[in-house]
Amino acid sequence: MATEMQAAPVLSTPDSLILEATEPVARQNATRTLSDEELSITYDIERTLQEIRQARYKRIALQFPDDMLPDAPRVFQLLSRGLACRDVDKITVEKNGNGTGGVESEKLAQDVSQLSVDDKPEPEPKLYILADTSYGTCCVDEVAAEHVNADVVVHYGRSCLSPTARLPVIYVFTHKELPIEPVIQAFKATYPDQATKIILAADVTYCDHIPAVYARLMEEGYTNLYATELIHCPSSAIPNRTVPDSVRENPDTLSEWQLFHISDPPTALLLTLASRVAAIHIYPTTDAPSDNVKPLPVSTSAALGRRYAILTRLSTVPIFGILINTLSVKNYLHIVEHVKQKIADAGKKSYMFVVGKLNAAKVANFSEIGGWVVIGCWESSLVDSKDFWKPVITPFELELALKGDHERVWTGAWQSDFQSILDQPAEEAQTADHEESPNDDDDMSEPESAPPEFDLRTGRYVSHTRPMRNPAPRVSAQSDDAVSAASGPAAARALARRAKGELAMIGGTVSPGAEYLRSQRTWKGLGSDFDIQYDDEDPSDSTLVVEGRKGIARGYTVGDSIEKH
Protein backbone atom coordinates (compact mmCIF):
# COMPACT_ATOMS: atom_id res chain seq x y z
CA MET A 1 0.00 0.00 0.00
CA ALA A 2 1.40 3.36 -0.97
CA THR A 3 2.39 5.66 1.86
CA GLU A 4 0.88 9.09 2.14
CA MET A 5 2.98 12.10 1.21
CA GLN A 6 4.36 13.91 4.22
CA ALA A 7 5.07 17.17 2.31
CA ALA A 8 4.23 18.84 -0.95
CA PRO A 9 6.49 17.89 -3.89
CA VAL A 10 9.23 20.29 -4.86
CA LEU A 11 8.33 21.66 -8.27
CA SER A 12 11.10 24.26 -8.62
CA THR A 13 14.81 24.60 -7.97
CA PRO A 14 16.05 26.59 -4.96
CA ASP A 15 17.07 30.21 -5.46
CA SER A 16 20.66 29.46 -4.51
CA LEU A 17 21.08 27.24 -7.56
CA ILE A 18 21.55 30.21 -9.87
CA LEU A 19 24.74 31.10 -7.99
CA GLU A 20 26.28 27.68 -8.51
CA ALA A 21 28.07 26.86 -11.77
CA THR A 22 26.63 23.40 -12.34
CA GLU A 23 27.20 23.26 -16.10
CA PRO A 24 29.52 25.03 -18.53
CA VAL A 25 28.02 27.98 -20.34
CA ALA A 26 28.87 26.64 -23.77
CA ARG A 27 30.52 23.55 -25.14
CA GLN A 28 34.14 24.19 -25.98
CA ASN A 29 35.00 23.57 -29.60
CA ALA A 30 37.85 21.16 -30.23
CA THR A 31 39.41 23.45 -32.86
CA ARG A 32 40.11 26.10 -30.23
CA THR A 33 42.91 23.92 -28.84
CA LEU A 34 44.80 23.87 -32.13
CA SER A 35 48.19 25.47 -32.28
CA ASP A 36 48.89 28.46 -34.49
CA GLU A 37 50.61 26.22 -37.02
CA GLU A 38 47.68 23.80 -37.17
CA LEU A 39 45.23 26.66 -37.40
CA SER A 40 47.27 28.19 -40.21
CA ILE A 41 47.02 24.95 -42.17
CA THR A 42 43.30 24.50 -41.48
CA TYR A 43 42.39 28.02 -42.60
CA ASP A 44 45.00 28.27 -45.38
CA ILE A 45 46.56 31.44 -44.02
CA GLU A 46 49.55 31.54 -46.39
CA ARG A 47 47.47 31.30 -49.57
CA THR A 48 45.07 33.93 -48.27
CA LEU A 49 47.92 36.33 -47.53
CA GLN A 50 49.44 35.74 -50.95
CA GLU A 51 46.21 36.57 -52.80
CA ILE A 52 45.63 39.68 -50.68
CA ARG A 53 49.15 40.95 -51.37
CA GLN A 54 49.01 40.30 -55.10
CA ALA A 55 45.72 42.16 -55.55
CA ARG A 56 46.67 44.88 -53.01
CA TYR A 57 43.35 44.68 -51.19
CA LYS A 58 43.04 47.25 -48.38
CA ARG A 59 39.67 46.41 -46.82
CA ILE A 60 39.16 42.69 -46.33
CA ALA A 61 35.93 41.17 -44.99
CA LEU A 62 36.21 37.76 -43.29
CA GLN A 63 32.97 35.76 -43.48
CA PHE A 64 32.71 32.84 -41.02
CA PRO A 65 29.85 30.38 -40.55
CA ASP A 66 28.46 29.96 -37.06
CA ASP A 67 30.44 26.82 -36.24
CA MET A 68 33.74 28.56 -37.09
CA LEU A 69 33.15 31.82 -35.24
CA PRO A 70 35.15 30.66 -32.17
CA ASP A 71 38.25 30.55 -34.41
CA ALA A 72 37.61 33.98 -35.96
CA PRO A 73 39.73 36.03 -33.49
CA ARG A 74 42.77 33.78 -33.91
CA VAL A 75 42.45 33.77 -37.71
CA PHE A 76 42.15 37.55 -37.57
CA GLN A 77 45.40 37.75 -35.58
CA LEU A 78 47.30 35.43 -37.92
CA LEU A 79 46.24 37.43 -40.98
CA SER A 80 47.06 40.74 -39.29
CA ARG A 81 50.57 39.56 -38.43
CA GLY A 82 51.15 38.34 -41.97
CA LEU A 83 49.95 41.58 -43.54
CA ALA A 84 52.04 43.71 -41.17
CA CYS A 85 55.30 42.24 -42.51
CA ARG A 86 54.24 41.96 -46.14
CA ASP A 87 57.01 44.18 -47.55
CA VAL A 88 59.91 43.38 -45.20
CA ASP A 89 61.60 40.95 -47.56
CA LYS A 90 61.09 43.25 -50.54
CA ILE A 91 62.69 46.24 -48.77
CA THR A 92 65.65 44.13 -47.66
CA VAL A 93 66.34 42.93 -51.19
CA GLU A 94 66.24 46.49 -52.58
CA LYS A 95 68.71 47.76 -49.97
CA ASN A 96 71.12 44.87 -50.50
CA GLY A 97 71.15 44.97 -54.31
CA ASN A 98 74.42 44.47 -56.25
CA GLY A 99 74.07 47.57 -58.44
CA THR A 100 73.49 45.85 -61.78
CA GLY A 101 72.00 48.02 -64.44
CA GLY A 102 73.37 51.15 -62.77
CA VAL A 103 72.91 53.45 -65.77
CA GLU A 104 69.24 52.63 -66.16
CA SER A 105 68.72 52.86 -62.40
CA GLU A 106 70.33 56.30 -62.20
CA LYS A 107 68.30 57.58 -65.13
CA LEU A 108 65.12 56.22 -63.59
CA ALA A 109 66.02 57.85 -60.26
CA GLN A 110 66.52 61.22 -61.96
CA ASP A 111 63.19 60.97 -63.74
CA VAL A 112 61.43 60.10 -60.52
CA SER A 113 63.12 62.97 -58.64
CA GLN A 114 61.79 65.45 -61.18
CA LEU A 115 58.21 64.40 -60.53
CA SER A 116 56.36 66.46 -57.93
CA VAL A 117 54.38 63.66 -56.35
CA ASP A 118 53.43 63.64 -52.68
CA ASP A 119 55.08 60.68 -50.99
CA LYS A 120 52.17 59.46 -48.91
CA PRO A 121 52.48 56.15 -47.10
CA GLU A 122 50.32 53.34 -48.42
CA PRO A 123 47.39 52.65 -46.08
CA GLU A 124 47.56 49.50 -44.03
CA PRO A 125 45.09 46.72 -44.86
CA LYS A 126 42.13 46.44 -42.51
CA LEU A 127 40.29 43.26 -41.63
CA TYR A 128 36.60 42.97 -40.68
CA ILE A 129 34.80 39.91 -39.31
CA LEU A 130 31.29 39.32 -40.66
CA ALA A 131 29.60 37.44 -37.85
CA ASP A 132 25.98 37.27 -39.00
CA THR A 133 25.12 36.60 -42.63
CA SER A 134 22.09 38.16 -44.29
CA TYR A 135 21.08 34.90 -45.99
CA GLY A 136 22.63 31.42 -46.12
CA THR A 137 26.15 30.71 -44.92
CA CYS A 138 27.02 28.99 -48.20
CA CYS A 139 26.62 32.27 -50.12
CA VAL A 140 28.94 35.25 -50.09
CA ASP A 141 27.36 38.06 -48.08
CA GLU A 142 28.05 41.05 -50.29
CA VAL A 143 25.46 43.13 -48.44
CA ALA A 144 27.31 42.91 -45.13
CA ALA A 145 30.65 43.40 -46.87
CA GLU A 146 29.46 46.61 -48.51
CA HIS A 147 28.57 48.01 -45.09
CA VAL A 148 32.31 48.22 -44.39
CA ASN A 149 33.14 49.17 -47.99
CA ALA A 150 35.18 45.98 -48.43
CA ASP A 151 37.38 45.35 -51.46
CA VAL A 152 37.22 41.56 -51.16
CA VAL A 153 35.45 38.87 -49.14
CA VAL A 154 37.30 35.89 -47.67
CA HIS A 155 34.67 33.16 -47.38
CA TYR A 156 35.42 30.33 -44.93
CA GLY A 157 33.79 26.91 -44.83
CA ARG A 158 31.71 25.10 -47.40
CA SER A 159 30.29 27.18 -50.21
CA CYS A 160 27.83 26.84 -53.07
CA LEU A 161 30.38 28.59 -55.35
CA SER A 162 27.67 30.64 -57.02
CA PRO A 163 29.16 33.53 -59.05
CA THR A 164 28.93 36.84 -57.24
CA ALA A 165 27.58 40.05 -58.72
CA ARG A 166 29.98 42.71 -57.44
CA LEU A 167 32.86 41.79 -55.09
CA PRO A 168 35.78 39.39 -55.68
CA VAL A 169 35.96 36.41 -53.35
CA ILE A 170 38.76 34.34 -51.83
CA TYR A 171 37.36 30.91 -50.95
CA VAL A 172 38.90 29.02 -48.04
CA PHE A 173 37.15 25.68 -47.68
CA THR A 174 39.29 24.75 -44.65
CA HIS A 175 41.15 21.47 -44.33
CA LYS A 176 39.61 18.43 -42.66
CA GLU A 177 41.44 15.23 -41.87
CA LEU A 178 40.44 12.09 -43.77
CA PRO A 179 42.07 8.66 -43.30
CA ILE A 180 42.83 7.45 -46.81
CA GLU A 181 43.11 3.71 -46.18
CA PRO A 182 39.50 3.19 -44.96
CA VAL A 183 38.29 5.08 -48.03
CA ILE A 184 40.26 2.75 -50.31
CA GLN A 185 38.92 -0.36 -48.61
CA ALA A 186 35.34 0.90 -48.79
CA PHE A 187 35.78 1.79 -52.46
CA LYS A 188 37.12 -1.68 -53.32
CA ALA A 189 34.23 -3.34 -51.50
CA THR A 190 31.70 -1.20 -53.36
CA TYR A 191 33.22 -1.58 -56.84
CA PRO A 192 34.84 -5.01 -57.23
CA ASP A 193 34.96 -4.61 -61.03
CA GLN A 194 38.01 -2.48 -61.75
CA ALA A 195 36.74 -1.57 -65.24
CA THR A 196 33.63 0.23 -63.96
CA LYS A 197 33.34 3.89 -64.93
CA ILE A 198 33.50 5.80 -61.67
CA ILE A 199 33.70 9.53 -60.93
CA LEU A 200 35.43 10.56 -57.70
CA ALA A 201 33.98 13.62 -55.99
CA ALA A 202 33.91 15.09 -52.51
CA ASP A 203 32.39 17.92 -50.56
CA VAL A 204 34.36 21.16 -50.86
CA THR A 205 35.84 20.68 -47.38
CA TYR A 206 37.32 17.30 -48.44
CA CYS A 207 38.16 18.05 -52.06
CA ASP A 208 41.90 18.36 -51.32
CA HIS A 209 41.97 14.58 -50.59
CA ILE A 210 40.74 13.60 -54.06
CA PRO A 211 44.21 13.50 -55.74
CA ALA A 212 45.59 11.18 -53.05
CA VAL A 213 42.57 8.86 -53.25
CA TYR A 214 42.76 8.83 -57.05
CA ALA A 215 46.48 7.97 -57.08
CA ARG A 216 45.97 5.21 -54.54
CA LEU A 217 43.12 3.64 -56.51
CA MET A 218 45.09 3.75 -59.74
CA GLU A 219 47.78 1.75 -57.98
CA GLU A 220 45.12 -0.83 -57.08
CA GLY A 221 44.40 -1.39 -60.78
CA TYR A 222 41.28 0.68 -61.49
CA THR A 223 41.32 1.89 -65.09
CA ASN A 224 38.16 3.98 -65.62
CA LEU A 225 38.44 6.52 -62.84
CA TYR A 226 37.95 10.26 -63.15
CA ALA A 227 38.95 12.67 -60.37
CA THR A 228 36.86 15.83 -60.36
CA GLU A 229 38.23 19.31 -59.76
CA LEU A 230 36.49 22.37 -58.39
CA ILE A 231 35.16 24.95 -60.83
CA HIS A 232 32.82 27.89 -60.37
CA CYS A 233 29.98 26.64 -62.56
CA PRO A 234 26.72 25.49 -60.91
CA SER A 235 25.31 24.83 -64.41
CA SER A 236 27.84 22.07 -65.10
CA ALA A 237 26.65 18.49 -65.61
CA ILE A 238 28.04 17.89 -62.11
CA PRO A 239 27.53 21.23 -60.36
CA ASN A 240 30.83 23.02 -59.65
CA ARG A 241 32.88 20.02 -60.78
CA THR A 242 34.74 19.10 -63.93
CA VAL A 243 33.48 16.17 -66.00
CA PRO A 244 35.21 13.68 -68.32
CA ASP A 245 35.94 14.79 -71.86
CA SER A 246 33.35 12.38 -73.26
CA VAL A 247 30.67 13.90 -71.03
CA ARG A 248 31.71 17.42 -72.00
CA GLU A 249 31.15 16.55 -75.67
CA ASN A 250 27.96 14.60 -75.05
CA PRO A 251 26.30 15.24 -71.66
CA ASP A 252 23.98 12.25 -72.11
CA THR A 253 26.92 9.87 -71.64
CA LEU A 254 27.09 10.86 -67.96
CA SER A 255 24.47 8.16 -67.36
CA GLU A 256 27.19 5.56 -68.03
CA TRP A 257 29.19 6.68 -64.98
CA GLN A 258 28.72 6.00 -61.27
CA LEU A 259 29.53 8.60 -58.61
CA PHE A 260 31.54 7.95 -55.45
CA HIS A 261 31.08 10.95 -53.17
CA ILE A 262 33.10 11.59 -50.00
CA SER A 263 31.01 13.21 -47.24
CA ASP A 264 27.30 13.96 -47.35
CA PRO A 265 26.39 16.17 -50.33
CA PRO A 266 23.58 18.74 -50.20
CA THR A 267 20.12 17.49 -51.07
CA ALA A 268 20.00 19.72 -54.14
CA LEU A 269 23.05 17.94 -55.56
CA LEU A 270 21.51 14.51 -54.99
CA LEU A 271 18.27 15.44 -56.74
CA THR A 272 20.19 17.01 -59.61
CA LEU A 273 22.39 13.96 -60.20
CA ALA A 274 19.68 11.36 -59.58
CA SER A 275 18.67 11.25 -63.24
CA ARG A 276 22.13 11.99 -64.66
CA VAL A 277 24.38 9.23 -63.29
CA ALA A 278 23.90 5.49 -63.08
CA ALA A 279 24.30 5.25 -59.30
CA ILE A 280 25.53 7.28 -56.33
CA HIS A 281 27.41 5.97 -53.30
CA ILE A 282 28.24 8.25 -50.36
CA TYR A 283 31.19 7.67 -48.04
CA PRO A 284 30.10 9.11 -44.66
CA THR A 285 32.54 11.25 -42.70
CA THR A 286 30.36 12.24 -39.75
CA ASP A 287 30.87 9.00 -37.81
CA ALA A 288 33.90 8.20 -35.69
CA PRO A 289 36.94 6.97 -37.66
CA SER A 290 36.59 3.27 -38.37
CA ASP A 291 37.98 0.73 -40.78
CA ASN A 292 34.53 -0.74 -41.49
CA VAL A 293 32.76 2.30 -42.94
CA LYS A 294 30.47 1.26 -45.78
CA PRO A 295 29.40 3.66 -48.54
CA LEU A 296 25.67 4.17 -48.60
CA PRO A 297 23.71 3.84 -51.86
CA VAL A 298 21.43 6.77 -52.56
CA SER A 299 17.78 6.55 -53.55
CA THR A 300 15.99 9.78 -54.39
CA SER A 301 12.74 8.36 -55.76
CA ALA A 302 10.76 9.29 -52.64
CA ALA A 303 12.14 12.84 -52.57
CA LEU A 304 11.49 13.37 -56.27
CA GLY A 305 7.98 11.97 -55.93
CA ARG A 306 7.29 14.40 -53.12
CA ARG A 307 8.50 17.31 -55.25
CA TYR A 308 6.25 16.25 -58.13
CA ALA A 309 3.25 16.02 -55.78
CA ILE A 310 3.93 19.63 -54.77
CA LEU A 311 3.85 20.68 -58.42
CA THR A 312 0.42 19.16 -58.99
CA ARG A 313 -0.81 20.92 -55.87
CA LEU A 314 0.36 24.30 -57.16
CA SER A 315 -1.09 23.98 -60.65
CA THR A 316 -4.34 25.69 -59.57
CA VAL A 317 -2.83 28.32 -57.26
CA PRO A 318 -3.90 31.84 -58.36
CA ILE A 319 -1.35 33.85 -56.32
CA PHE A 320 2.39 33.17 -56.07
CA GLY A 321 4.92 34.81 -53.79
CA ILE A 322 8.47 35.42 -55.02
CA LEU A 323 10.99 35.16 -52.19
CA ILE A 324 14.30 36.94 -52.76
CA ASN A 325 16.75 34.78 -50.83
CA THR A 326 19.94 36.35 -52.19
CA LEU A 327 21.27 39.74 -53.16
CA SER A 328 24.71 38.50 -54.19
CA VAL A 329 24.29 35.75 -56.78
CA LYS A 330 24.94 36.96 -60.28
CA ASN A 331 21.89 37.50 -62.53
CA TYR A 332 19.41 37.17 -59.66
CA LEU A 333 17.51 40.22 -60.97
CA HIS A 334 17.18 38.57 -64.38
CA ILE A 335 15.62 35.43 -62.94
CA VAL A 336 13.23 37.56 -60.85
CA GLU A 337 11.94 39.26 -63.99
CA HIS A 338 11.78 35.91 -65.78
CA VAL A 339 9.69 34.36 -63.00
CA LYS A 340 7.36 37.37 -62.84
CA GLN A 341 6.81 37.20 -66.59
CA LYS A 342 6.11 33.46 -66.49
CA ILE A 343 3.51 33.89 -63.76
CA ALA A 344 1.88 36.80 -65.60
CA ASP A 345 1.76 34.85 -68.87
CA ALA A 346 -0.09 32.08 -67.06
CA GLY A 347 -2.77 34.55 -65.96
CA LYS A 348 -1.75 34.44 -62.31
CA LYS A 349 -0.67 37.12 -59.87
CA SER A 350 2.72 37.42 -58.15
CA TYR A 351 3.97 39.43 -55.20
CA MET A 352 7.63 39.90 -54.34
CA PHE A 353 9.08 39.62 -50.82
CA VAL A 354 12.55 40.17 -49.36
CA VAL A 355 12.62 38.53 -45.93
CA GLY A 356 16.31 37.80 -45.30
CA LYS A 357 16.86 34.38 -43.77
CA LEU A 358 13.89 32.22 -44.67
CA ASN A 359 11.79 30.54 -41.99
CA ALA A 360 8.23 29.30 -41.67
CA ALA A 361 7.08 32.05 -39.31
CA LYS A 362 7.87 34.84 -41.76
CA VAL A 363 5.99 33.46 -44.75
CA ALA A 364 3.04 32.27 -42.64
CA ASN A 365 1.98 35.90 -42.23
CA PHE A 366 0.82 36.02 -45.86
CA SER A 367 -2.03 33.54 -45.99
CA GLU A 368 -3.26 34.78 -49.38
CA ILE A 369 -0.15 33.36 -51.06
CA GLY A 370 -0.80 29.88 -52.43
CA GLY A 371 2.82 28.98 -53.21
CA TRP A 372 6.30 30.43 -52.90
CA VAL A 373 9.13 30.59 -55.44
CA VAL A 374 12.61 30.99 -53.94
CA ILE A 375 15.23 33.00 -55.82
CA GLY A 376 18.56 31.97 -54.34
CA CYS A 377 21.67 29.93 -54.91
CA TRP A 378 21.39 26.42 -56.27
CA GLU A 379 21.69 24.91 -52.77
CA SER A 380 19.43 27.18 -50.70
CA SER A 381 16.63 27.26 -53.31
CA LEU A 382 15.55 23.77 -52.29
CA VAL A 383 13.36 24.08 -49.19
CA ASP A 384 12.01 20.64 -48.31
CA SER A 385 10.81 21.33 -44.78
CA LYS A 386 7.34 20.38 -43.56
CA ASP A 387 7.20 23.41 -41.28
CA PHE A 388 6.02 25.69 -44.08
CA TRP A 389 2.28 26.12 -44.43
CA LYS A 390 2.40 26.60 -48.20
CA PRO A 391 4.81 24.82 -50.58
CA VAL A 392 8.14 26.40 -51.50
CA ILE A 393 9.51 25.59 -54.96
CA THR A 394 12.37 26.54 -57.27
CA PRO A 395 12.13 28.43 -60.59
CA PHE A 396 12.62 25.13 -62.44
CA GLU A 397 9.67 23.59 -60.61
CA LEU A 398 7.60 26.69 -61.32
CA GLU A 399 8.08 26.12 -65.05
CA LEU A 400 6.47 22.70 -64.68
CA ALA A 401 3.72 23.86 -62.32
CA LEU A 402 2.54 26.55 -64.74
CA LYS A 403 2.12 24.08 -67.58
CA GLY A 404 -1.25 22.53 -68.29
CA ASP A 405 -2.08 19.01 -67.21
CA HIS A 406 -1.80 17.82 -70.79
CA GLU A 407 1.63 19.47 -71.23
CA ARG A 408 3.28 18.62 -67.92
CA VAL A 409 5.55 15.60 -68.32
CA TRP A 410 7.63 14.43 -65.37
CA THR A 411 10.82 12.79 -66.63
CA GLY A 412 12.57 12.55 -63.26
CA ALA A 413 15.07 15.26 -64.21
CA TRP A 414 15.54 18.00 -61.66
CA GLN A 415 17.75 21.06 -61.38
CA SER A 416 18.06 23.98 -59.00
CA ASP A 417 20.44 26.36 -60.80
CA PHE A 418 18.43 29.19 -62.33
CA GLN A 419 21.17 30.15 -64.79
CA SER A 420 20.34 27.08 -66.88
CA ILE A 421 16.76 28.38 -67.12
CA LEU A 422 17.95 31.77 -68.35
CA ASP A 423 20.17 30.11 -70.94
CA GLN A 424 17.29 28.15 -72.46
CA PRO A 425 16.10 29.41 -75.86
CA ALA A 426 12.95 31.47 -76.00
CA GLU A 427 9.76 29.46 -76.20
CA GLU A 428 7.36 29.49 -79.11
CA ALA A 429 4.33 31.74 -79.27
CA GLN A 430 1.80 31.35 -76.51
CA THR A 431 -1.39 29.34 -76.91
CA ALA A 432 -4.55 30.78 -78.34
CA ASP A 433 -5.81 31.60 -74.84
CA HIS A 434 -2.93 34.03 -74.39
CA GLU A 435 -3.53 35.64 -77.74
CA GLU A 436 -7.23 36.29 -77.20
CA SER A 437 -8.07 39.92 -76.60
CA PRO A 438 -9.75 40.68 -73.27
CA ASN A 439 -11.75 43.49 -74.87
CA ASP A 440 -13.72 41.14 -77.09
CA ASP A 441 -17.25 40.77 -75.71
CA ASP A 442 -17.58 37.22 -77.02
CA ASP A 443 -14.31 35.93 -75.58
CA MET A 444 -14.33 34.86 -71.94
CA SER A 445 -17.22 37.22 -71.22
CA GLU A 446 -18.46 35.00 -68.40
CA PRO A 447 -16.48 32.87 -65.94
CA GLU A 448 -18.55 29.85 -67.02
CA SER A 449 -17.04 30.05 -70.51
CA ALA A 450 -13.57 29.13 -69.21
CA PRO A 451 -12.76 25.43 -68.89
CA PRO A 452 -13.11 24.17 -65.33
CA GLU A 453 -9.98 23.52 -63.33
CA PHE A 454 -9.73 21.10 -60.43
CA ASP A 455 -7.19 20.58 -57.71
CA LEU A 456 -5.66 17.20 -58.57
CA ARG A 457 -4.78 16.62 -54.93
CA THR A 458 -8.19 17.27 -53.35
CA GLY A 459 -10.49 17.05 -56.37
CA ARG A 460 -12.12 20.39 -55.56
CA TYR A 461 -13.18 22.87 -58.21
CA VAL A 462 -11.12 26.08 -58.16
CA SER A 463 -13.02 29.10 -59.45
CA HIS A 464 -10.18 31.62 -59.85
CA THR A 465 -7.01 29.83 -60.93
CA ARG A 466 -6.04 32.52 -63.44
CA PRO A 467 -7.48 35.78 -62.08
CA MET A 468 -5.40 38.04 -64.31
CA ARG A 469 -7.05 36.62 -67.44
CA ASN A 470 -10.52 37.76 -66.44
CA PRO A 471 -11.91 40.57 -68.59
CA ALA A 472 -12.09 44.13 -67.31
CA PRO A 473 -15.22 44.76 -65.25
CA ARG A 474 -18.22 46.08 -67.08
CA VAL A 475 -21.07 47.93 -65.43
CA SER A 476 -24.45 46.42 -66.26
CA ALA A 477 -27.06 49.16 -66.59
CA GLN A 478 -30.71 48.89 -67.51
CA SER A 479 -31.50 52.56 -67.89
CA ASP A 480 -30.11 55.45 -69.85
CA ASP A 481 -28.99 57.08 -66.63
CA ALA A 482 -27.01 54.02 -65.72
CA VAL A 483 -25.45 53.90 -69.17
CA SER A 484 -24.42 57.54 -68.99
CA ALA A 485 -23.00 57.00 -65.52
CA ALA A 486 -21.00 54.02 -66.69
CA SER A 487 -19.57 55.96 -69.62
CA GLY A 488 -18.97 59.14 -67.64
CA PRO A 489 -15.95 60.25 -65.69
CA ALA A 490 -14.36 58.13 -62.99
CA ALA A 491 -16.21 60.00 -60.24
CA ALA A 492 -19.57 59.02 -61.76
CA ARG A 493 -18.56 55.35 -61.74
CA ALA A 494 -17.15 55.37 -58.22
CA LEU A 495 -20.32 53.91 -56.66
CA ALA A 496 -21.09 51.44 -59.43
CA ARG A 497 -21.86 48.03 -57.94
CA ARG A 498 -19.41 45.25 -58.73
CA ALA A 499 -20.79 42.38 -60.73
CA LYS A 500 -21.31 39.11 -58.89
CA GLY A 501 -18.13 37.00 -58.80
CA GLU A 502 -15.94 39.83 -59.99
CA LEU A 503 -12.53 40.38 -58.35
CA ALA A 504 -11.56 43.51 -56.46
CA MET A 505 -9.79 46.31 -58.31
CA ILE A 506 -7.02 48.68 -57.21
CA GLY A 507 -6.14 51.55 -59.52
CA GLY A 508 -8.04 49.96 -62.37
CA THR A 509 -6.08 46.69 -62.07
CA VAL A 510 -7.39 43.37 -60.83
CA SER A 511 -5.89 42.62 -57.41
CA PRO A 512 -6.30 39.03 -56.18
CA GLY A 513 -4.61 40.03 -52.94
CA ALA A 514 -7.18 42.74 -52.28
CA GLU A 515 -9.95 40.31 -53.16
CA TYR A 516 -8.60 37.87 -50.58
CA LEU A 517 -8.58 40.61 -47.96
CA ARG A 518 -12.13 41.61 -48.88
CA SER A 519 -13.57 38.11 -48.83
CA GLN A 520 -11.43 36.30 -46.25
CA ARG A 521 -10.06 38.94 -43.91
CA THR A 522 -12.97 41.38 -43.66
CA TRP A 523 -15.24 41.23 -40.62
CA LYS A 524 -18.84 42.00 -41.53
CA GLY A 525 -20.07 42.47 -37.98
CA LEU A 526 -23.32 41.21 -36.45
CA GLY A 527 -25.75 39.54 -38.76
CA SER A 528 -23.06 38.23 -41.09
CA ASP A 529 -24.45 34.71 -40.93
CA PHE A 530 -26.46 35.41 -44.08
CA ASP A 531 -25.62 37.03 -47.41
CA ILE A 532 -26.86 40.54 -48.14
CA GLN A 533 -29.26 40.52 -51.08
CA TYR A 534 -29.87 43.35 -53.54
CA ASP A 535 -33.18 44.52 -54.97
CA ASP A 536 -32.76 42.80 -58.32
CA GLU A 537 -31.86 39.47 -56.78
CA ASP A 538 -34.03 36.80 -55.25
CA PRO A 539 -34.67 37.65 -51.61
CA SER A 540 -33.93 35.03 -49.01
CA ASP A 541 -35.49 34.67 -45.60
CA SER A 542 -33.37 35.76 -42.72
CA THR A 543 -33.76 35.39 -38.99
CA LEU A 544 -36.38 37.72 -37.53
CA VAL A 545 -35.48 39.99 -34.67
CA VAL A 546 -37.40 38.87 -31.58
CA GLU A 547 -37.46 40.03 -28.00
CA GLY A 548 -35.16 38.03 -25.78
CA ARG A 549 -34.98 37.42 -22.08
CA LYS A 550 -35.18 40.23 -19.57
CA GLY A 551 -34.95 40.53 -15.84
CA ILE A 552 -32.35 39.83 -13.21
CA ALA A 553 -30.37 36.76 -12.24
CA ARG A 554 -33.02 35.68 -9.76
CA GLY A 555 -35.47 35.20 -12.55
CA TYR A 556 -35.92 36.00 -16.22
CA THR A 557 -39.01 36.48 -18.33
CA VAL A 558 -39.25 35.82 -22.04
CA GLY A 559 -41.30 38.25 -24.08
CA ASP A 560 -44.76 38.95 -22.69
CA SER A 561 -44.77 35.81 -20.57
CA ILE A 562 -44.89 36.29 -16.81
CA GLU A 563 -43.28 32.93 -16.13
CA LYS A 564 -39.82 33.29 -14.70
CA HIS A 565 -36.90 31.09 -15.61
UniProtKB/Swiss-Prot annotation:
Corresponding gene? dph2
Q: Where in the cell is it found?
A: Cytoplasm
Q: How does it assemble?
A: Component of the 2-(3-amino-3-carboxypropyl)histidine synthase complex composed of dph1, dph2, dph3 and a NADH-dependent reductase, predominantly cbr1.
Report whether Kinase shows up as a keyword of the record.
Answer: no
Q: In which pathway does it act?
A: Protein modification; peptidyl-diphthamide biosynthesis
Provide a GO CC annotation, any one: 2-(3-amino-3-carboxypropyl)histidine synthase complex
Q: How is the cofactor bound?
A: Binds 1 [4Fe-4S] cluster per subunit. The cluster facilitates the reduction of the catalytic iron-sulfur cluster in the dph1 subunit.
Cofactor(s) required, per the database record: [4Fe-4S] cluster
Q: Which InterPro entries match?
A: DHP2, DPH1/DPH2, DPH1/DPH2_1, DPH1/DPH2_3
**Which Gene Ontology MF annotations are present?**
2-(3-amino-3-carboxypropyl)histidine synthase activity; 4 iron, 4 sulfur cluster binding; metal ion binding
User: Which residue intervals make up region (Disordered)?
Assistant: 424-458, 464-483
Annotated positions binding [4Fe-4S] cluster: 139, 160, 377
Q: Which NCBIfam families match?
A: diphth2_R (TIGR00322), DPH2 (TIGR00272)
Q: What is this protein called?
A: 2-(3-amino-3-carboxypropyl)histidine synthase subunit 2
| A Pfam short name | Diphthamide_syn
Source organism per entry reads Aspergillus fumigatus (strain ATCC MYA-4609 / CBS 101355 / FGSC A1100 / Af293) (Neosartorya fumigata)
A single GO BP term for this record reads: protein histidyl modification to diphthamide
